[in-house]
Regions:
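Bacterial N-terminal signal peptides that target proteins for export
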Residues: 1-10
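N-terminal leader/presequence-like segments
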Residues: 5, 24-25
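A motif-centric signal for short, conserved binding hotspots located
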Residues: 27-355
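C-terminal segment of classical bacterial N-terminal signal peptides
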Residues: 16-24
Length: 355
């Protein structure tokens, strides 16, 4: 029996090693050893970045896997670079190498206002102890995933378990309806959307992310599933509440006290100004990757034009900001503070009468 058990064990290990050295039938691409290590030992050296074993037999963590320089050829999105990324005026130019979320490089270099201070990348913000616009419930430093992060399940404290089933069961070809983590936009649990296959490396009006937004009639509507509702988990009063965005019952028809989000520009009182979005006339305007808008259309048909169907000109947080970071104050997409002497006025894409 002992010899039989030993042979069975040997065959099991051999089978596992064969799996790890060959193609792995998962949604992630490449061989399994690109991400996993069986024993954290190879040729008398440890395999993991830290030297210690990681959860789920991973070679690295979120930051380690997503640190590098985007070239347009890499299949894994890099959101942090150890060298200055190429951003240019808006981060969308042909000579830029950042993605839709921007890059953590600047905030990791000690520039607090240039991005989110994620644990492991940047020190806690020297000025802000709580997220601006927050209700005080989020206490502690932001992480990539888990209960203190943006990605994965908010019910899991640890980052790796929070992403369980995400990478292996992701199907990028379908509308991400938020019903499961694997079916959530960019592993942002419950958030809907349709992602560009190259993560907006050199985006155009014909190739970009499709962000989900909701045209609200009241700020009490939390707009579940929208990309802006994700931001509102930490920055609540910039998105929803009571008299936080517009006083009383005048949401969309009266005076704003904070910039609206999850609101369709076609419903604005001065809608004629916004009908000129990105140089258009109010019908079939070209989509802007510099100042993008969200849509309520939940299909894989890309929104290459705006003012084409109902609720397709929805202002969102990402119309102005990069989620990870940028070289500009407040993680803005463009250098508004340098305008008009220099920089780019992305505000003018929507506010056409004020440029």
């Amino acid at each position: 029996m002992g010899k039989k058990t030993g042979l069975t064990g040997l065959l099991t290990v051999t089978a596992l090693l064969s799996v790890l050295s060959g193609p792995c039938p998962a949604r992630v691409t490449g061989v399994c050893v690109n991400c996993h290590t069986m024993h954290n030992s190879q040729n008398n050296f440890t395999v993991t970045d830290s030297g210690s074993p990681n959860q789920a037999l991973l070679v690295s963590d979120c930051i380690g896997c997503h640190t590098g320089q985007n070239t347009g050829i890499n299949t894994e999105p890099y959101v942090h670079d150890t060298n200055p990324p190429l951003y240019s005026a808006t981060g969308t130019e042909a000579d830029s190498n950042t993605l839709a979320g921007g890059n953590f490089y600047w905030v990791s270099s000690g520039l607090d206002r240039m991005g989110h201070n994620v644990e492991g990348l940047a020190a806690p913000d020297a000025t802000l102890s709580l997220p601006p616009g927050g209700d005080g419930s989020f206490v502690g430093q932001l992480r990539c995933a888990g209960s203190m992060g943006c990605h994965g399940s908010r019910l899991e404290v640890e980052q790796i378990p929070a992403l369980k089933g995400g990478h292996h069961y992701k199907d990028h070809s379908i509308w991400q309806d938020g019903s499961t983590l694997a079916k959530s936009y960019r592993f942002l649990d419950t958030i809907q959307g349709f992602g560009d296959s190259s993560y907006e490396y050199h985006p155009t009006d014909l190739r970009h992310n499709k962000y989900y937004g909701i045209d609200r009639s009241a700020e009490s509507d939390q707009a579940a599933g929208s990309i802006s509702s994700l931001c509102a988990r930490c920055h609540k009063y910039f998105h929803n509440g009571t008299d936080s965005v517009a006083p009383g019952s005048t949401f969309g028809t009266g005076v704003w006290i904070r910039h609206p989000t999850d609101f369709d520009m076609s419903n604005a009182t001065s809608s004629s100004e916004y009908q000129g979005y990105n140089g258009g006339s109010g019908t079939g305007n070209p989509y802007s990757v510099i100042s993008p808008v969200a849509t309520a259309d939940a299909s894989t048909t890309l929104n290459t034009t705006v003012y084409t169907r109902a609720n397709d000109a929805v202002v969102m947080c990402l119309s102005c900001h990069r989620a990870h970071g940028s070289p500009y104050t407040s993680s803005l997409r463009w250098d508004y503070k340098a305008w008009p002497a220099g920089g780019y006025n992305g505000c003018g894409v929507c506010h056409t009468s004020k440029d």
